[in-house]
A protein has these predicted regions:
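Hydrophobic, helix-prone linear segments
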Residues: 1-24, 30-39
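Short hydrophobic/aromatic beta-strand micro-patches
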Residues: 3, 46-50, 110, 169-173
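Short, conserved charged micro-motifs
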Residues: 8-12, 52-57, 115-118, 174-176
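Terminal peptide-recognition signature
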Residues: 14, 45, 123, 168
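Vicinal oxygen chelate
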Residues: 16, 24-30, 61-111, 125, ...
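Structured alpha/beta or helical-core interaction and ligand-binding surfaces enriched in interleaved
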Residues: 20, 117, 133
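Short, solvent-exposed beta-strand edge segments and adjacent coil->beta transition regions
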Residues: 40-44, 102-106, 163-167
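Short acidic/Ser/Thr-enriched loop-to-helix initiation segments
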Residues: 118-126
Length: 192
């Protein structure tokens, strides 16, 4: 779920940005009156840039994205922000773990080095996703080995400055619906 000042605009932007390819996951926008307060979101989305990633970045900029500098330095991806300032990355060809040429390919959760294994265990139990990679950069979970979208957790962890604008939502039939905190204090939602 993504907090949005203008739900219709954000829904349209992300539908176009992902080309409707979200690996079966739903991006849900929740109305809010509060603009983004944190310097950097603790959760962000990664899109595949495809073989012509420069053209994909240009396309996203024409949709309303802007370039963003979060101190990333020289990295093999481009950091952009959606129309409400939420950062997302456009991964270049050959990026490890990318199983699609376009659309949403990762949900990235900032966690500290010390918390990543606890977070892996936590999200495996909450979402029933499975670890497929574990490296010094973090861990990657998928619903199934061929799922195009992964949950990537790793450092550096952005400081918790405010309520997260982007939050994970899971469906659990055996748990009371509501908002909860994960092992690092990130809000997430449970639906029945």
């Amino acid at each position: 779920m993504i907090d949005a000042l203008d739900v219709a605009r954000m829904d349209r932007f992300w539908l176009d940005a992902t080309r409707g390819r979200t690996g079966g996951l739903q991006l849900r926008f929740v109305p809010t009156m509060k603009p983004k307060a944190a310097h950097k979101n603790r959760l962000h989305l990664d899109l595949a840039g495809g073989p012509d990633w420069e053209a994909e970045v240009a396309r996203l900029l024409t949709l309303g994205a802007t370039r963003a500098d979060i101190g990333q330095g020289d990295v093999p991806w481009d950091v952009l922000a959606d129309p409400e300032g939420n950062e997302f990355c456009v991964l270049r060809p050959g990026h490890p773990g990318v199983l699609a040429d376009s659309g949403l390919v990762a949900i990235c959760l900032d966690v500290s080095e010390e918390e990543r294994y606890a977070q892996r265990a936590f999200w495996q139990s909450q979402a029933d996703w499975h670890a497929v990679e574990s490296h010094d950069w973090g861990v990657r979970l998928r619903r199934a080995p061929a799922s195009t979208v992964s949950l990537v957790m790793g450092p550096p962890a952005a400081p918790k400055e405010a309520r997260n604008r982007l939050r994970l939502e899971v469906t659990q039939r055996d748990r009371e619906p509501g908002e909860f905190l994960d092992a690092s204090g990130n809000e997430f939602h449970v639906t029945g």
